[in-house]
Amino acid sequence: MMARRDPKSWAKRLVRAQTLQKQRRAPVGPRAPPPDEEDPRLKCKNCGAFGHTARSTRCPMKCWKAALVPATLGKKEGKENLKPWKPRVEANPGPLNKDKGEKEERPRQQDPQRKALLHMFSGKPPEKPLPNGKGSTESSDHLRVASGPMPVHTTSKRPRVDPVLADRSAAEMSGRGSVLASLSPLRKASLSSSSSLGPKERQTGAAADMPQPAVRHQGREPLLVVKPTHSSPEGGCREVPQAASKTHGLLQAARPQAQDKRPAVTSQPCPPAATHSLGLGSNLSFGPGAKRPAQAPIQACLKFPKKPRLGPFQIPESAIQGGELGAPGNLQPPPAATELGPSTSPQMGRRTPAQVPSVDWQPPHSTPCLPTAQACTMSHHSAASHDGAQPLRVLFRRLENGRWSSSLLAAPSFHSPEKPGAFLAQSPHVSEKSEAPCVRVPPSVLYEDLQVSSSSEDSDSDLE
């Protein structure tokens, strides 16, 4: 019997059974998934719900007609708005509506105050309010400022009017009353100052004595006032009204004249002070071993009080040859003394002209004479920096013609410092006889004496 069955009929039966099974299925609708399909660890990427994936048929994004509401897995307190606000009623306005109402009432209360201020400044009679109330707001719109309310004047006095506006008619004053109310006090001060510039420009003689600002010199005829610091026999203060193009030339011509009349001590650097005090006839010559000293930064010559003289020099009498000499001064060698040879510094000791008699001495050597300003340009700190080095000695001599000549003794050999006699014997200007014991003099005292002696020599030469 099995062999008699047709295979085609068996295939047809199988197809019919499958179709019947499909028909017997329930229609597509919301159905609860089996418990084994729900997995809280899974999350759908389409809808964001937990318990299924994006491929699952439970996803509401795939079946819009029968979308399932994702059930909450647990209570989420604090995230959901369980107590929403009740709808507001107009009878019970909130705090925001109250603030808006107060802001609307404030400008209405300020309107009468603005009207009173406008009436006080302008002097106009108060306008009658219209029945609809539109005219009052339009008239005061130009006075409203966004920055803040109008200033309230507590005093009953009327505002002070500038003198420039005093000559105008009363109609113009009443029209510009509101403009003056908005002007700041600084603006009024500038107007008053500009109005008072007219009569001041006419005063030429009195303007020279009164202190004027720098802007006043830019007029048509500026006043040039030249006031030298010290009185001069030739002329004094002059007031010359000239054009603005000649002022610079006169100032440049007047400044050097005022500087030439100043004394040599008034806060000037050392080279000009030395040239004024020593004069043109002074000549400073040094010994054969001396070289041109290196110039240091110029320092102002300040007069210090005289200090008590220190102990005498330790110079043996047998080492000095010849007649009377000036007091030799101890000098510390500069930093380059070992390489460049001996050099001079302004810490030189000498005696006053009254103590040093004029005696015939040997003529000075034909060495190039250094200017007198060179001695003052040396730094005073170079000598104090080398305490362990051997001191240098300079001899000052008074010649017959009233000039001074100085000679620098040769530096001693550093190998035998115990023999000062051999060191002094090498100098061609050393004499055999010795004067009274020499004492050390501060350099400030010596420089002051040198200025006095040179000024006396200049006066003697002028008398001759």
From Swiss-Prot:
Pfam families: zf-CCHC_6. Residues 74-89, 97-114 have a biased composition (Basic and acidic residues). Residues 180-197 have a biased composition (Low complexity). Residues 1-42, 70-387, 415-437 are annotated as: Disordered. InterPro entries: FAM90, Znf-CCHC_6. Belongs to the FAM90 family. This is Protein FAM90A18. It comes from Homo sapiens. The lineage of its organism: Eukaryota, Metazoa, Chordata, Craniata, Vertebrata.
